[in-house]
């Protein structure tokens, strides 16, 4: 090897070695091209089902009593969990403050917050999809009474 480098430096090279190397590399490429697709290594293939099963969606039910409980609700949203929040056991002023805090959290995460009942809200992270309206059902119930 050292002699080859020295020979190339002075412009003297052994062309026979280069020809053998070229023939070897071209024949190797031809062999790889003729292999069937089934014999190719599949180390980088992952089942889609295994990825779906690892991420389970959860919905957390929460009844805050004080303003500091808003941090727990926000933490659940950060952990990609939807949260149903019932404010029936809180004063309206404290409930408004928590709704404002959670609205900011949801906005920062690109999620959604929806009113689903009297003093009940649903806050969802961005990967959750909600469909339909409960308010239509509540209006029909009021008309029946």
Swiss-Prot record:
Keywords: Cell cycle, Cell division, Cytoplasm, Septation. InterPro entries: Cell_div_SepF (IPR023052), Cell_div_SepF/SepF-rel (IPR007561), SepF-like_sf (IPR038594). It is found in: Cytoplasm. GO terms for cellular component: cytoplasm. GO terms for biological process: division septum assembly; FtsZ-dependent cytokinesis. It holds the Pfam family SepF. PANTHER family: CELL DIVISION PROTEIN SEPF (PTHR35798:SF1). Cell division protein that is part of the divisome complex and is recruited early to the Z-ring. Probably stimulates Z-ring formation, perhaps through the cross-linking of FtsZ protofilaments. Its function overlaps with FtsA. Homodimer. Interacts with FtsZ. Belongs to the SepF family. This is Cell division protein SepF. It comes from Lactobacillus helveticus (strain DPC 4571). The lineage of its organism: Bacteria, Bacillati, Bacillota, Bacilli, Lactobacillales.
